[in-house]
Amino acid sequence: MAEVTVIGGGLAGCEAAWQLAEAGFSVRLLEMKPVQYTPAHRYEGLAELVCSNSLKADRINSAAGLLKAEMTRLGSLLMRCARKSAVAAGGALAVDRKQFSDLATEAIRNHPNITLETAVVTEIPETPTVVATGPLTDGALAADIEKHCGTRLSFFDAAAPIVSFESLDKEKVFF
């Protein structure tokens, strides 16, 4: 069985590990928690949501809803966990963060083709690897990625902008 290493146990890393394992690959999932946390992470589980608990609109006629429908049809682990941990949120799919993380962690730990290892990765392995470490990548690994790619990492924060009332054009806004 071919082996693939996935670095990072967040949303992308868990989904990548799951899909590879379901396709018959032997997956080694490397996650640095609980040995090392980032400033945003607080919980020891995988697939930790650090910002909003909302996975956005659930309507099929929205881009976010269509993506979720497609992921579900493709056997997405995270969509299954999201549905099982859903909380009331109007037309959005929102989840209980702890339950969502616990469900994803349990599924990853119990998959026969996935080995979960706790490790702070500082270099990209020479073997087939998916790097899914996100915007808070450990400094040593970020430097190794830069060495391989020849450029620094660039991420945009998902924090919502703050708009002051005084800055609004009262002729154009609706209250």
Locations of regions flagged by a protein language model:
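Beta1/beta-strand and adjacent pyrophosphate-binding region of the FAD-binding site
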Residues: M1-A12
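Helical element adjacent to the flavin cofactor pocket in flavoenzyme catalytic cores
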Residues: R97-L116
